[in-house]
Amino acid sequence: MNGFVNWYTASVKRSPRLTNGIMTGSLFGIGDVIAQVGFPEKKGQKYDLARTVRAVVYGSLIFSIIGDSWYKFLNQKVIVKPGKHWTNTAARVGCDQLLFAPVGIPMYYGVMSILEGKSLVDAKKKIEDNWWPTLVTNWYVWPAFQLINFSLVPVHHRLFSVNIISIFWNAFLSFKNSISPSDKKVPVNFPPVPE
C-alpha cells in the first residue's frame, strides 16, 4: 500500500489534473459496477457498459476538477481562526456539507440525466425526486468522514481519500440514479383522492 501511496503522491504532484481525473473516474466506474452487479434494479438485468462509461466520464471530467478545486479552496480560504485546527476543520466540514453537498447532488443527477440523453425536463424531475433524500443520506455518511479527512489528510490527498470512500457512495448514487419514476412504489390511492 505504501508503494501505491508514494506513486500516487508523485503522480499528483507531477500531473494533478490527469492523475485526479483517472483516479476519480476509475472509482466512479467501480462504484457503478458495484451498483449494477450487487444491486440490480430488476432481477436478471444485464450489465450496462454505457452506464459505467457515463459514471467514468462524470468522475473524470467533472467531479475530479470540481472536487480538487473545492478541497483546495476550503483549505486556503476557510480559516475562521488562524492556528485553531479544530475550529477551522469544523468550519470546513460545515461549508462542505451546507454549501457543496446541496449543489453537488443535483449537479450529479442533472449531468447524468443529460449524459443518458434525457431532456432538461427529465433532468429537472430526477433532481426534484432525488435531491432531498440523497442530501439527507449524505449527511449520515459524509460529515464524520470529512471531519477526519480535513483534520488528518494532507490537502493534495483529500480528493483521493474521498474517492476511496466514494466507491460505496457512488454505488448508492448510481443505484438511485438508475431508478425510473415507474420503479418507485406509490400508495394505492396515489394521487391522493379527497375523501
From Swiss-Prot:
Pfam families found in the cross-reference section: Mpv17_PMP22 (PF04117)
Key words, A-Z: Membrane, Mitochondrion, Mitochondrion inner membrane, Transmembrane, Transmembrane helix
Topology relative to the membrane: Multi-pass membrane protein
Disulfide bonds: none
Matching InterPro entries: Mpv17_PMP22
Stretch forming the signal peptide: none
Its job: May be involved in cellular response to stress. Required to maintain mitochondrial DNA (mtDNA) integrity and stability.
Listed name of the protein: Protein SYM1
Organism field: Kluyveromyces lactis (strain ATCC 8585 / CBS 2359 / DSM 70799 / NBRC 1267 / NRRL Y-1140 / WM37) (Yeast)
Gene it is expressed from: SYM1
